[in-house]
Each structure stands twice: as C-alpha cells, then as structure tokens.
C-alpha cells in the first residue's frame, strides 16, 4: 500500500477562472505569495496583475482551446481553480430561460469544460483541481433554482471526477458561503445581503484553497466548507 507523503505540495502553475476579481483574485494573490504562477482567465482580465487571458467559460469549445494554449505557453499546468461564477435570483417562472441557462453554463458547464481541457496536463504531474460550489449547493432555498442546480451539480461533478481519476489527480470541492465581493452588486434589496450580513473575507476563503492545493500528495481534501463563524445558512 502506498504511503502518503508528509511534505506539502509546492504551489506551481495554477489556472484560475474568474481570477481578476473576488475569490478568484484572492486565490491568485495567494498563489503568487506562495511562490506559484497564477494564470488568470476572466471576462475582463484587465484588473489582474498576473498573466491574464480574456475568456468566456460559456463558450465551452473556445475555453477548452484557450486552456490548451495557456498550458502550452507555460509548459503545462499544476492546478486549476474554477472560481468563475454568477447568479440570477428569482422565481423559476419569472426568470427568462436564456438568463437561467447562462447561470448553469457559467457555473457548471464552464467548470467542466475548463477541467476537461486541463486534465491531460494535470494527469502528467499529479496536479490538483479545486472546484467552487456554495452553501446553496448543499442547501436549497426559494428563488435560487438556477444557482442551486449549478452548485449541486458542481459537487456531483467533482465527486464523480475524483472517483474517475482514482488518485491520479487531487480533486477538492470548496463550499463557501457569502463573501465580501461584487457578487451581490446590482441586486434588488430583496436579494441583497443586509447591512448586518455575515459575509466572509475572500482572502480567508482563498487561504483554504491554498491549503488544499498544498496538501501532501496521497492525502486529499475532498470537500472543504468555509464561512463566517456566525453564518446562519449552514447546513
């Protein structure tokens, strides 16, 4: 029986979707501070100080080609963090179908496309994948059918990927609650966090991602939940 290493895994070439803002940007900063190389994909990558590429994860074939190009330019990939995500709260019969489906496309189909394209490179180096679900990926609430469907789906996708790859790569699912990011910008008061909402600092959540990326090989963190200590939505 193989013995798991006790040495931390070095942080290397880490591809981060949604990496120019919010949680993704915090992860990119953490990767850089750990001595790794952040490789950012974002709809608007201009705010990122790192190697950054414009890409829309809903263009699944296009994003697969972009991931392949990034891997070629940097001689491979060591890790992927799928932090790109959107939401459109509202009742199912009130949200236009194309808007509802875009939430699924970004959060779930985009995640799968990026991981699919990165997988051959990760398999070569026993790389790691960190997918991003949500506390609403384990707990359903009203007016969140698209978001919950996508985030429940990310958990199912990640568990199946771990079973499929059987230790050839590390697979971790991050399950965060609300964070102090622009995620809630533009929402009506009905769906916006109140002034006393317990939102986590994305840097704190990013530290959990870095912990998973650096965990010793052979000892995998399959799922990790991170939230404010007074978060009421868990479980």
Regions found by a protein language model. Give the residues of each.
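Residue(s) in the substrate-gating loop at a strand-loop-helix junction
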Residues: 134
């Amino acid at each position: 029986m193989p013995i798991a290493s006790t040495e931390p895994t070095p942080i290397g070439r880490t591809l981060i979707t949604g990496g120019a803002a919010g949680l993704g940007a915090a992860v990119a900063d953490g990767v850089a501070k750990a001595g790794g190389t952040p490789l950012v994909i974002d709809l608007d990558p201009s705010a990122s100080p790192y190697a950054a590429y414009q890409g829309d994860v809903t263009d699944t074939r296009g994003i697969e080609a972009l991931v392949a190009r990034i891997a070629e330019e940097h001689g491979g990939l060591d890790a992927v963090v799928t932090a790109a995500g959107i939401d459109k709260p509202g009742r199912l019969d009130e949200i236009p179908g194309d808007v509802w489906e875009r939430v699924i496309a970004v959060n779930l189909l985009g995640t799968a496309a990026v991981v699919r394209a990165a997988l051959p490179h990760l398999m070569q180096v026993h790389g790691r994948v960190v997918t991003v679900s949500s506390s609403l990926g384990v707990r359903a609430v009203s007016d969140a059918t698209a978001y919950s469907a996508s985030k429940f789906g990310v958990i199912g996708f990640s568990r199946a990927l771990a079973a499929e790859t059987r230790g050839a790569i590390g697979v971790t699912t991050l399950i965060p609650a609300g964070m102090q990011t622009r995620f809630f910008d533009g929402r009506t008061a009905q769906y916006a966090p109140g002034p006393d909402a317990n939102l986590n600092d994305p840097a704190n959540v990013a530290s959990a991602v870095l912990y998973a990326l650096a965990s010793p090989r052979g000892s995998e963190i399959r799922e990790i939940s991170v939230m404010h200590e007074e978060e009421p939505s868990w479980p």
